[in-house]
Curated annotation (Swiss-Prot):
Main location: virion
Protein name listed in UniProt: Transcript termination protein OPG145
Subcellular location: Virion
Keyword Lipid metabolism set for record: no
SMART domains documented for this protein: DEXDc
EC nos: 3.6.4.-
Subunit relationships: Interacts with OPG087. Might be part of a transcription complex composed at least of OPG087, OPG110, and OPG145.
Domain of life, per lineage: Viruses
Length: 493
């Protein structure tokens, strides 16, 4: 820990990393406060900030020679086999760490690698290479299984803890496994933080973008007050401000053979309204809709739009164009709606629900990986980050209000490299509720733009359903509306 006065150059360097976001740190009294320029307080500067050689400092950081927390179950023959790009990452990490050791810098590195790169297996290789006792911290238990599989493949002694940290501490008094796989809420326990700071050298923060370290969270406090000897942040979409806690980044681009297509399933609807819809419309401009809660609630009860989504999915699935589908909503009730409707059509052998309230969901996710055809309905919160079903070939985005980081993570669910190359995403920019028509169009255009400009998708117009079924809800009400629709689409390509 280093308590320092906030001199101008230090403040400028830290503030630059926040990209306009308020800079917040722990002060000498232990309060987590916004840092003002010229402040007379001393602040706790995160250890990982000094990982970059561009940060000038006279501070000297302890090295691995001061600890003896070595893995005992290591077997070099169990090291995973890596692809060339993954080996390149390992080479970059080892080279950077040698330089850090020579210059007595903290061994903190962010691995900024694309969705589907294989961050888990690459990090397990690094873990085995370092030979140091390791804590793997995940944001939710959905991610436990993929880590368990890779750690077991390396042959490392490990312990998984997702519930009570108190019972874990009791077990650690008699045994200290080489690898601990825990959920981040364990870091709310100071005794546990002290224990891993003393007995474990390597800390791996998986999906680091899910933590806003400019907030006073358990992870923020852990990194500030109990900084590990070595640390990896793993993410495909790094938060700029989090770099303050891990100020060295390795990013290696991945070329892909995947054929990625995004369809905008557009349609004009007759205006649709109910008493419930009219009630929610009144709240659109109020403070209760600050995070677009009512915008998403309106989408969840937009029956013509919901029917369009169902019609499109059913037609594509029955035709065999797509086979392993992820359906994503923002709200739980919207998820349940689609699940029930699809369950009636295809049955429980095909349709599954990713419900955060069901403790059996992780086991169910594990089981459907072996299926050739399935429909998995879930929420953005539960499955938008870290869902490990590599065989997914299609994604239906039923919600609209999604930030750029969430969009990239969500699209990454269908960008895992497999022998099958076709990947398809469906978005639905139309709504029958006129009060949110342009808002939904703008949000959907952001999803399309990011997928095309950053992730290599090709945008195509989806006309099959509208043309094949003139009686469906997506039929336009007049020839003039069809013309306007084409004009609108051409302007937004």
């Amino acid at each position: 820990m280093s308590l320092l006065k906030m001199e101008y150059n230090l403040y400028a360097e830290l503030k630059k990393m926040t990209c306009g976001q308020p800079l917040s740190l722990f002060n000498e009294d232990g309060d987590f406060v916004e840092v003002e320029p010229g402040s007379s307080f001393k602040f706790l500067i995160p250890k990982g900030f000094y990982a970059s050689p561009s940060v000038k400092t006279s501070l000297v950081f302890e090295t691995l020679t001061t600890t003896d927390n070595k893995i005992t179950s290591i077997n070099p023959t169990n090291a995973p086999k890596l692809y060339p790009l993954q080996r390149k990452v390992v080479s970059e990490v080892v080279s950077n760490m040698r330089k850090m050791i020579e210059s007595k810098r903290p061994l903190y590195i962010t691995l900024h690698l694309a969705c589907g790169f294989g961050k888990t297996i690459t990090t397990c290789y690094l873990m085995a290479t370092h030979g140091r006792k390791t804590v793997i911290c995940v944001p939710n238990k959905m991610l436990i299984h993929q880590w368990k599989t890779q750690v077991e493949a390396v042959g490392l002694e490990h312990k998984i803890s997702i519930d009570g940290v108190s019972s874990l501490l009791k077990e650690l008094k008699t045994q200290s496994p080489d690898v601990l796989i825990v959920v981040s809420r364990h870091l709310t326990n100071d005794a546990f933080c002290k224990y891993i700071n003393k007995h474990y050298d390597l800390f791996i923060l998986d999906e680091s973008h899910t933590y806003n370290l400019m907030n006073n969270t358990a992870v923020t406090r852990f990194l500030a007050y109990y900084p590990p000897m070595m640390c990896y942040f793993l993410t495909a979409t790094p938060r700029p401000a989090n770099r303050i806690y891990c100020n060295s980044i390795i990013n290696i681009a991945k070329l892909s053979d995947l054929k990625k297509t995004i369809y905008a399933v557009d349609s004009f609807f007759e205006p649709y309204s109910t008493d419930n819809i009219r009630h929610m419309i009144k709240r659109l401009d109020g403070p209760s809709n600050k995070y677009h809660i009512y915008t998403e609630k309106l989408l969840s009860v937009d029956e013509p739009r919901n029917q369009l989504i169902l019609d499109t999915l059913v037609e594509e699935f029955k035709s065999g164009t797509i086979n392993r589908i992820l359906v994503i909503t923002k709200l739980r009730e919207h998820m349940v709606f689609f699940y029930k409707r699809l369950l009636d059509l295809f049955g429980p052998e095909v349709v599954f629900i990713g419900d955060a309230q069901n403790r059996r969901t992780p086991d169910m996710v594990k089981s459907i990986k072996e299926l050739n055809r399935f429909i998995f309905v879930s929420t953005l919160f539960y499955s938008g980050t870290g869902l490990d079903i590599p065989s997914l070939d299609s994604l239906f985005i039923c919600s609209a209000v999604i930030n750029n980081m969430q969009i990239e993570q969500l699209l990454g669910r269908v960008c895992r490299e497999t022998e099958l190359l076709d990947r398809t995403v469906y978005v639905f920019p139309s709504t029958s509720i006129k009060e949110i028509k342009y808002m939904i169009g703008n949000f959907m255009q952001r999803i399309i733009s990011l997928s095309v400009d950053k992730l290599g998708f090709k945008q195509k117009s989806y006309r099959k359903h509208q043309e094949s079924d003139p009686t469906s809800v997506c039929t336009t009400s007049s020839r003039e509306e069809r013309v306007l629709n084409r004009i609108f689409n051409s302007q937004n390509r």
